Amino acid sequence: MKKIFIVYGHYNDRSFNAAIKDTFIKTAEEKGHKIDCLDLYKENFNPVFSGEKPGKEVLDHRKRIEESNVIVLIAPIWNFRMPAIVEGWIDKVLAPPWAFRFKKLFGNYGFPIGNLKGKKAVVFCTYGSPQFAIRTFFLNMPTKRLRRGVFNICGITDVVYKRFFAVPFVSQEKRQKFLEIVKKTALNV
């Protein structure tokens, strides 16, 4: 049994992202995993970081991460990034010195040392764009940024990334195939 912490970032309970969340939770629970789901919109998470020290909410989210084996992030990609509420959550929660620290090399130069080693991350993202455009013209920018610029810096190197393209334009049959991928991912987490 694994403890899975889900961070969900979509405002619409009838969105395809909600279907991903619900499918993942149902499948993982049937497999015997323990789920802890954070719905950023329902909890009215304030994504604005103004240099303040971590408050109770951020400290609670960090504790929930510490108690988990797997972090699952579910959100759409809008304008080649996740919604501001998710980006702000990353900025506030997965921040130094808690999630990573810098080891000084020389002068003002250092490199990050992750503090979340041994954890796994699973990222589910939906796109309105077709896969060809994202891979060709935008060089998988959202994927690389999350994998390298967020999770790897925090010490999480086991990152599974599942992307679903052109979601507003695909058939219901194709969406069901997407949800089968979600089920398989939940079974193999």
Task: Label the predicted regions.
Residues H33-N44, K162-F165:
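A short beta-strand-loop structural module common to alpha/beta enzyme folds
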Residues E57-L146:
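Helix-loop-strand module that forms the ligand-binding subsite of alpha/beta enzymes
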Residues K3, E29, K34-D36, K119-A121, ...:
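Residues at the starts of beta-strands that form the adenosine-phosphate
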Residues V7-G9, L38, F124-T126:
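Short hydrophobic segments within beta-strands
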Residues K2-H33:
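N-terminal beta1-alpha1 ligand-phosphate binding loop
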Residues A133-V189:
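Glycine-rich phosphate/pyrophosphate-binding loop and the adjoining helix
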Residues Y11, E43, Y127-F132, A166-F169:
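A short, flexible beta-alpha/helix-coil linker loop
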Residues L40-K56, R175:
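N-terminal beta-loop-helix "entrance" segment that forms/cooperates
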